[in-house]
Amino acid sequence: MNITFLGTSSGVPSLTRNVSSLALKLSQSAEVWLFDCGEGTQHQIMKSNIKSSQIKKIFITHMHGDHIYGLPGLLATLGLSGNSEGIEIYGPSELRSFINSALKSSFCKLSFPLHFVEVENFALKNKILFENNKIKVNCACLKHKIPAYGYRVSEKDKPGVFDIKKAESLKIAPGPIYSELQQGKKVVLPDGRTFDGKEFCGPPREGESFVYCTDTVFSESAVSLSKNADLLVHESTFSQTDERMAYEKLHSTTIMAAKTALLSNTKKLIITHLSPRYTNKNSITPGDLLKEAQKVFPNTHLAKDFLTAEIK
């Protein structure tokens, strides 16, 4: 899996950073999942390597405008293109009425179905939000001025590496049988021989995991959600020097994000959702924010618009 940042600014866009949105590309799939959709997200998608027609699920963290104002426009554009077969939208309970109202008021009729999933009960009861044979999604309540939710996407373990040489030495002809063996299935060859796929595969490979947490002040639930994750994307609206403001507005400082990564044993942290007050022309720069976080959690990286990062 990999992610592409489509917006990394907090509150309002700047000349170099749009407001919040992130695209997740799934492994061995053309499917894309979108996390938050601030104003201008569809323009950002056009400038990226993401195809809007591949978006199948949208996860919204909370109802502040810098995370949702791009949704009606994106959905309307997808409707005009006729490429979408339907989209699942996960988020707070108010999200359905916001989207339906915006579409109805602008006389927009979509050519595809929307399926809404309210996430609050899943977060409160620690229930799996979505699951198939390859992946599952969990969510958790964060700590912000309005209800906000973090999301975790976890791949299930993958089959071990297939030993082609062993198969060849046993004169098993290449073809669909190799795929069945790699999946650990038992197969019967035309000559009557029977093989168990487990004999040809190494130990299962651990699936990748990605966590997205914004908006929130430091939260123990974010730590729990991020436990042993490969990649945590966490908001860092404020510098540590503005910690008081962070508590007032219930946003995170760089240190809070780094502490979340450290306590959760996350492998890699990327900080995002930066306040526009921090620019290269001001006394505190985005580079300074990165250095603050790295003092607590060395494997920290700084998000920027259109940055693509592998989960592992």
UniProtKB/Swiss-Prot annotation:
The keyword Hydrolase applies. The active site is at D66 (proton acceptor). GO terms for molecular function: 3'-tRNA processing endoribonuclease activity; zinc ion binding. Its EC number is 3.1.26.11. SUPFAM superfamilies: Metallo-hydrolase/oxidoreductase (SSF56281). InterPro entries: Metallo-B-lactamas, RibonucZ/Hydroxyglut_hydro, RNase_Z/BN. Its cofactor is Zn(2+). It is an enzyme of class 3 (hydrolase). It catalyses: Endonucleolytic cleavage of RNA, removing extra 3' nucleotides from tRNA precursor, generating 3' termini of tRNAs. A 3'-hydroxy group is left at the tRNA terminus and a 5'-phosphoryl group is left at the trailer molecule. The keyword tRNA processing applies. Zn(2+) 2 binds at D66, H67, D215, H273. It holds the Pfam family Lactamase_B. Keywords: Endonuclease, Hydrolase, Metal-binding, Nuclease, tRNA processing, Zinc. Zn(2+) 1 binds at H62, H64, H144, D215. Binds 2 Zn(2+) ions. NCBIfam families: PRK00055.1-3, RNase_Z. Homodimer. Zinc phosphodiesterase, which displays some tRNA 3'-processing endonuclease activity. Probably involved in tRNA maturation, by removing a 3'-trailer from precursor tRNA. Belongs to the RNase Z family. This is Ribonuclease Z. It comes from Prochlorococcus marinus (strain AS9601). The lineage of its organism: Bacteria, Bacillati, Cyanobacteriota, Cyanophyceae, Synechococcales.
